[in-house]
Amino acid sequence: ANANYRDSDVRLTNPVRDARALAEELRRDGFEVVLKENLGKEDMQRTIDQFAATVPSGATVLFYFSGFGIQVNRQNYLIPIDARIWAERDAQQDGISVERTLGQIHAKGAKVLLLIIDASRKNPFERRFRSYSAGLSATAVPERTVAISSASLDKAHDDVDANPSMFMSELLKEMRAPRQSTAEQVFLRARNGV
């Protein structure tokens, strides 16, 4: 979760709180959790590399990111806190590719990958080179991957200070619901609840 962006006058409050709430819920359910906060590109990439290297074959993996994200040519990039973005090429250079990250995790033999990206915020970087925030595009996901974004595709939302955010509140509510559901059903109900 990234919130303290160095090259931005916008301070996010939800990403770290939401990541902690999700981590707590997953630990309560018996999952092993790796939680990292406010990482620059080098640390983000190293964390992803180390995480992917430890994925046991046949595991179910949940990858969550909250912070700023930018799409460039229908590819999504997670933005590290030390990114300096003034043009699309900067997002490609300084960002972390969602598609590459998915490929890394699947290459290690994850049976199922659950992807949650809460990065469709209107962000200060995009406004430097676009007249609007484009949100995130559809991610080409490998087989056995279920993906959800906090906003509809190609839409961006304002970061509203809530603890937890509306999206995370709905996701946690659906995860705790007593009914038997697939991850896809939980994700769909959470997003529809927002």
Regions found by a protein language model. Give the residues of each.
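Active-site histidine-acidic residue metal-binding/catalytic motifs
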Residues: 1-10, 27, 82-85
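Short beta-strand elements in bilobed, periplasmic/extracellular small-molecule ligand-binding domains
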Residues: 26-36
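Glycine- and acidic-residue-enriched helix-capping/strand-helix junction motifs
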Residues: 5-20, 160-163
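Cell-envelope and extracellular/periplasmic
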Residues: 1-4, 151-153, 172-179
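Caspase-like (clan CD) cysteine peptidase catalytic core
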Residues: 39-66, 70-128, 163-167, 172-187
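Extracellular S/T/G-rich loop segment that most often corresponds to the catalytic His/Ser-adjacent loop
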Residues: 113-162, 169
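An often Trp-containing, charged/polar helix-loop segment at the C-terminal end
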Residues: 187-194
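Short beta-strand-loop
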Residues: 10-15, 72-80, 136
